[in-house]
């Protein structure tokens, strides 16, 4: 019985939140595109210049999904853009969309540790991955493959909310693209 009440109150809160979002004023937002390299993204993430906000979910990709994403970059395939909120007061950027991708690249290239079980981050040993990269850590890639991965550019859409004076655009954008 308590669980049902909790579910009902969650639904009511969610409805109220959606109504509040629907009644927001019009936004005044500046947005621009950028094409940072993977090297730039993981350096900024490592140094705390790009952060995961509380609204973002935790890391949820499994190793197969993460491996396929890295392989996509190694193959030269296009990947979705990331969304970053520019916070003028701190000079930081918050990841609105793209956390799984940025974290995967950071962990593979920078840490070399798979978050799921703290093992060495190797691409999966499966037919879904090109045999050239199958079961390899970043350090085991050829120098040209390492360079290709680090130099790969991922399009970023960066925005800065000017009005209203709260951060509601961040929530609106997050909710609409996720």
Model-derived regions: residue spans:
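Basic- and aromatic-enriched surface patches that contact anionic nucleotides/nucleic acids
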Residues: 2-14, 18, 22-40, 53-178
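A short, surface-exposed helix-loop junction/capping segment
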Residues: 46-54
